[in-house]
């Protein structure tokens, strides 16, 4: 800002004396580190390994730890169990490691009891219907929805009926 007095002009310094720069150190991902994979399906799933010999099998609703390099290789080679519809949404196997999900640009959320409770909290049957049709598209997700409804004991007939119509199963 400029001030004038007695025909002289003084200028105040508006530049800060110290500029603080935050540096965030990012460590490279360790490809040998084992990360958690969760099977969202109500049946056993598996795939052949790319990085080494053998296969990975995950029991229904179970989880297993697999080297990050194997998971990234499977994802980049188009494993539908991990990729779902192509970008990680609607996948049968959930990658439960934030660093790996960020590396692969996966933004989908885990479908669990909390997510279903949030969906059941939606007011209005039309909005609820739109959300369940958008969220639960694969057979594994539909079976999971019915299972969670049974476990949580929801008591909204119209919403439960809508889920039954979508899934083709009864609660």
Would you name each region that the model predicts?
Residues 20-109:
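Compact, well-ordered interaction domains used in eukaryotic information-processing assemblies
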Residues 7-26:
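N-terminal intrinsically disordered, low-complexity tails
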Residues 1-7:
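Arg/Lys-rich low-complexity patches in intrinsically disordered regions that function as generic
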Residues 110-171:
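Charge/polar-rich, low-complexity and marginally structured segments
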């Amino acid at each position: 800002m400029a001030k004038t007095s007695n025909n002289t002009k003084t200028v105040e310094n508006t530049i800060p004396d110290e500029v603080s720069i935050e540096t965030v150190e990012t460590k490279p991902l360790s490809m040998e580190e084992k990360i958690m994979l969760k099977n969202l399906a109500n049946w056993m799933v598996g795939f052949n390994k790319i990085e080494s010999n053998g296969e990975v099998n995950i029991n229904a609703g179970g989880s297993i730890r697999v080297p990050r390099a194997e998971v990234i290789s499977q994802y980049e080679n188009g494993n539908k169990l991990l990729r779902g519809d192509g970008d990680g949404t609607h996948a049968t196997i959930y990658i439960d490691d934030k660093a790996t999900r960020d590396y692969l640009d996966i933004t989908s959320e885990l479908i669990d009891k909390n997510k279903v409770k949030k969906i059941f909290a939606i007011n209005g049957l039309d909005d609820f219907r739109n959300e369940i049709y958008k969220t639960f598209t694969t057979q594994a997700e539909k079976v999971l929805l019915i299972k969670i409804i049974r476990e949580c004991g929801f008591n909204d007939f119209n919403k439960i009926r809508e889920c039954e119509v979508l899934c083709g199963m009864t609660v």
